[in-house]
Every structure is written in structure tokens, then in C-alpha cells.
């Protein structure tokens, strides 16, 4: 069977899968989920169709940032075993195609958001894309050990965008959601970077773990403590305060336990401790935002 003017079907499907991988779909799912929590927590109502369009625009914006990140970092991705099978270093998509895809989705997502939702949400979406693709990827990532801290701002935008899709303006509540993701990001990524620090060093990426294992552990513990505290604050604004505080305290205690176990290890960080924290942090973010949505 032949599709698309003589292009074989298996090739067309392969290309579609490659472009999908270019958009970093796992990050996209998380972004849409946290943005949806912002919409649910926000006071007032939003037309279901407008809410759907907003979520799709946020997903497109996330994919656009992912594509631009892979375009710029293709040289690094080719060196690291964790990323060398990505579409560009494996030769399945060219750098030019990735750039075109990223730019097109960036413009389209912001334009549709401004046209159908509101200008504030569109501006925040544009800032999120620019912060990840330009400030983090092009400026910070190869220059400072604090790259993931400052770069985490980009990933913290979605719940604020979701909130403003409903209200038209950010608020303290939406900024608390922002801070949860901002404080969650460093422990999440640093836990994994402890296992991959040799590859980061080879690729020339100045991750904190490349400079000091102990400092990385200390930073992870510090951010985990701050996350524990800040994650309790949405309880001041949700309808089911007691239930939320019980959930947030329980999740935070497990997170801190993983961080403490990693901190107290002597010598080389073990895969068990690093992956234990990294894996639980994914569940933590999903569960804490689920709790916020359910208790609102």
C-alpha cells in the first residue's frame, strides 16, 4: 500500500512516530496534567471546548519546546547513551526538520491560545516556550551547575497558564502550584544525574553532580525540605483542607525519606537510592496534583 504521493506506508508511520518522539510526549502528558489541575483549582468556570483548546495549546507549546531542545542539543544527545537513540542523533529526523517543527508549533500554539482563550495565557505560554528553548537550553544548560534550577521555571508555568485560562490573571494559588513544580524539579533531575554524571562530563554539561556528589546530595535534601513545606500551603485554599494536608504530609514524608537515604549513603551513590528517589518523585508530582484537584 502506498500513501502520501508514493511514500510507503511503513515509512510514513515511522516518520510520524519519530516526530511524536521529537515532541517529548512524556513531558507533554505531565504538562497537560498540571495545567488541567490549574484549571480545576481556579475559581469560576470555563467552557469545556475552551478548556480543551487551552490544554491542546499547552500540549503543542510543550512539544514545540521539546523539539527546539532536541534541535539545539543534538550534539550532546549523540554522545550520551540515554539520548543517542533520539530522532536527530539516530538520523531519523534532520536538525532542519526539528527546527521547523519546533518553530511552527510554537507560533501555532501561541496564536490559537490568544485567539480562543485569552492574551494573558498566550503570553505566559510564549514565555514558557522561550524560557525552556532559549534561556535553559541555549544559555544555561552548558554554562552553570544551577542550570536545572533556573530552567525549572519553564516547567512550572503550565498550572499558571491553566489557571489564567479560566480567570484571565495569575493569583497566589496558581503561584503555589508554580512553586511546587519549581522546587520538585531539582531533586527529580539531580537524582538521575548522579548516576549519569560521567556521561554529562563527557558531553561537557556542567551538572552539579559532575562537580560534587556530596553537594548534589545536600542540595537534593534542601530542596526536598522546601518542597515539603510549600506543598502544604495549597491546603489553605482547597475545599477539603484536612484531607489534602494528610495526603500532602504523607507524600512529603516519603519524598524526604528517599532524599535522606540518598544523603546518608557513603561513597558512590547507589542506583537503588538514586532511582528510588527519581521514580517516587514522578509518582509524587502526579499524586500531589491529583490531591489538589480532588480537594478543590
UniProtKB/Swiss-Prot annotation:
Which cellular components does GO assign to this protein?
Answer: plasma membrane
Give the similarity note: Belongs to the UbiA prenyltransferase family. Protoheme IX farnesyltransferase subfamily.
Q: Which UniProt keywords apply?
A: Cell inner membrane, Cell membrane, Heme biosynthesis, Membrane, Transferase, Transmembrane, Transmembrane helix
Functional note: Converts heme B (protoheme IX) to heme O by substitution of the vinyl group on carbon 2 of heme B porphyrin ring with a hydroxyethyl farnesyl side group.
Q: Which GO terms describe its molecular function?
A: protoheme IX farnesyltransferase activity
Membrane-spanning ranges:
27-47, 48-68, 98-118, 120-140, 148-168, 175-195, 219-239, 242-262, 274-294
- Give the location in the cell: Cell inner membrane
- Asked if the keyword DNA-binding belongs to this entry, the reply reads no
Originating gene: ctaB
Q: In which pathway does it act?
A: Porphyrin-containing compound metabolism; heme O biosynthesis; heme O from protoheme: step 1/1
As for membrane topology, the entry says: Multi-pass membrane protein
Q: Which InterPro entries match?
A: Protohaem_IX_farnesylTrfase (IPR006369), UbiA_prenyltransferase (IPR000537), UbiA_prenylTrfase_CS (IPR030470), UbiA_sf (IPR044878)
Main site of residence? Answer: membrane
Q: Which CDD domains match?
A: PT_UbiA_Cox10 (cd13957)
Q: What else is known?
A: Carbon 2 of the heme B porphyrin ring is defined according to the Fischer nomenclature.
Q: What is the recorded name of this protein?
A: Protoheme IX farnesyltransferase
Keyword Membrane on this protein?
yes
Q: What is its EC number?
A: 2.5.1.141
Which reaction is catalysed here? heme b + (2E,6E)-farnesyl diphosphate + H2O = Fe(II)-heme o + diphosphate
BP GO terms, sorted: heme O biosynthetic process
Amino acid at each position: 500500500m502506498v500513501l502520501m504521493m508514493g511514500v510507503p506506508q511503513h515509512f510514513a508511520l515511522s516518520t510520524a512516530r519519530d516526530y511524536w518522539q521529537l515532541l517529548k510526549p512524556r513531558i507533554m502528558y505531565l504538562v497537560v496534567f498540571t495545567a488541567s489541575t490549574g484549571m480545576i483549582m481556579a475559581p469560576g468556570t470555563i467552557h469545556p471546548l475552551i478548556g480543551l483548546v487551552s490544554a491542546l495549546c499547552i500540549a503543542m507549546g510543550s512539544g514545540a519546546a521539546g523539539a527546539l531542545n532536541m534541535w539545539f542539543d543534538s550534539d550532546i544527545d549523540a554522545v550520551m547513551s540515554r539520548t543517542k537513540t533520539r530522532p536527530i542523533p539516530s538520523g531519523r529526523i534532520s536538525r532542519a526538520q526539528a527546527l521547523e517543527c519546533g518553530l511552527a508549533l510554537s507560533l501555532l500554539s501561541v496564536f490559537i491560545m490568544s485567539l480562543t482563550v485569552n492574551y494573558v495565557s498566550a503570553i505566559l505560554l510564549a514565555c514558557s516556550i522561550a524560557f525552556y528553548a532559549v534561556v535553559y537550553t541555549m544559555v544555561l544548560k552548558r554554562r552553570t551547575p544551577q542550570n536545572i534550577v533556573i530552567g525549572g521555571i519553564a516547567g512550572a508555568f503550565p498550572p499558571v497558564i491553566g489557571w489564567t485560562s479560566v480567570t484571565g490573571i495569575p493569583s497566589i494559588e496558581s503561584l503555589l502550584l508554580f512553586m511546587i513544580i519549581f522546587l520538585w524539579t531539582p531533586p527529580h533531575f539531580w537524582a538521575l544525574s548522579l548516576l549519569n554524571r560521567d556521561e554529562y562530563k563527557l558531553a561537557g554539561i556542567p551538572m552539579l553532580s559532575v562537580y560534587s556528589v556530596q553537594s548534589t546530595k545536600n542540595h537534593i535534601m534542601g530542596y526536598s525540605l522546601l518542597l515539603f513545606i510549600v506543598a502544604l500551603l495549597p491546603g489553605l485554599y482547597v475545599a477539603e483542607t484536612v484531607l489534602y494536608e494528610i495526603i500532602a504530609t504523607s507524600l512529603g514524608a516519603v519524598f524526604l525519606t528517599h532524599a535522606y537515604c540518598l544523603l546518608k549513603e557513603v561513597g558512590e551513590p547507589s542506583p537503588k537510592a538514586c532511582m528510588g528517589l527519581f521514580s517516587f518523585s514522578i509518582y509524587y508530582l502526579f499524586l500531589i496534583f491529583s490531591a489538589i484537584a480532588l480537594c478543590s
